[in-house]
């Protein structure tokens, strides 16, 4: 039962961008609504006594990491509007894993031996190959799609910076868990407002996009529940399966068209993107 619950964060987080697309409204309504939805979960945690105001580090780190999450999510949604979910999510997930792994290795000393460096670089190569495979161009893909892909890549790089800072700021200061989520949700809401401030939004679309934000928050709660039960490494590894949920959801639920060649590339790429972090976790715990 605990292992099944540990799989739920991947299901919920992988569904967030799918729900964003299904309810529509464009990236600015989507990011505003999503961050406000996360704030609703944060307020519920506050009201149930799961937010503590006696640690200034948690408050500041929570606000900063939440704001950078909004940056990452907002630009990810901009990429989705250009190239779709099934192309955006594997690339985005792979780039995030590359960024967080390299940061942890270089600045937090997680690769402290020659064996760890060698195996870690192998994991990075697997990630890069996986990203490339999921990006294979279809035989009959229009030139407009190639132009949009070119526009999406710098957007995804900005998104990656947002997500990586969101993760590593918390790692640096040892801030984690349910106590930080309320402050993160405030940072997210502020970030969402800033990103959408100069763009036209509608109340109706923003309200619909509260749903994916609430779903994201619930995914976090399942993560917090499962970590003590199955361990941080297993919980983290399971959470990376979100890329399968979002990518296949984009193809089969949203109807994003792929030819046989692209489907083979997507499946192979997903396998590598999922295997690489598992491989990194193994080397982290077995080659100290």
From Swiss-Prot:
Source organism, top-level taxon: Bacteria
Keywords from the named record: Cell membrane, Membrane, Sugar transport, Transmembrane, Transmembrane helix, Transport
Segments passing through the bilayer: 4-26, 33-51, 56-75, 82-104, 114-136, 148-170, 180-197, 206-225, 230-252, 264-283
Keyword Ribosomal protein among UniProt keywords: no
GO molecular function per UniProt: carbohydrate transmembrane transporter activity
GO CC entries: plasma membrane
UniProt keyword Transmembrane, yes or no: yes
Pfam families (UniProt xref): Sugar_transport (PF06800)
Localization per record: Cell membrane
Membrane topology: Multi-pass membrane protein
NCBIfam families, A to Z: RhaT (TIGR00776)
Function text: Involved in the uptake of glucose.
PANTHER family listed in its UniProt record: TRANSMEMBRANE PROTEIN 144
Protein name, entry field: Glucose uptake protein GlcU
Species for this entry: Staphylococcus xylosus
